[in-house]
Amino acid sequence: CADALCLEHYGLSERSYDIARRAAEIARACVERYSAGSRRRFVAGSVGPSTRNISLANDVTEEQLGDVYETVIRGQLDGGVDLILVETVMDSRNASIAVERCRRLNAEIPIAVSAVLSRLEGRVANGAPIATFLKELPMDDIALVGFNCSSSPRAMGASLETLAAECDKP
């Protein structure tokens, strides 16, 4: 994770942009090296989970979290990513802040959002029902929605069925 809040632990918060940009550049170089003919590959810039869940954090504001996300996204865009993946999301507000900051920087790049599922079936990690989570996202700015963590394959399958019924995005 290249966000400054995660990097604080290592004394590297000031390197957030550089780390995000360099990671994207390395991935872009690999894509260029291994793409051949019709087998095109893509680079997704990961805006991973922050160490702060905005609904619970009392030490960071939405503006501060947005600035943290924006720095990472700017680095990834400058490094040549093809899409932004807001991933391992536990809170719709965190995801929305990341999506909004991405759109400020680039109106066209595809954005995917991938949430963590709760152990409670049909809910995301913060306990919100999947349908509520989806309604709270800025869906007009999002190209793809999915999940990347679950307690079991069965729970993932049931959640994907709910996602398919509630969302018209791939």
PLM feature spans:
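Domain-level signal for soluble alpha/beta catalytic cores
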Residues: C1-P170
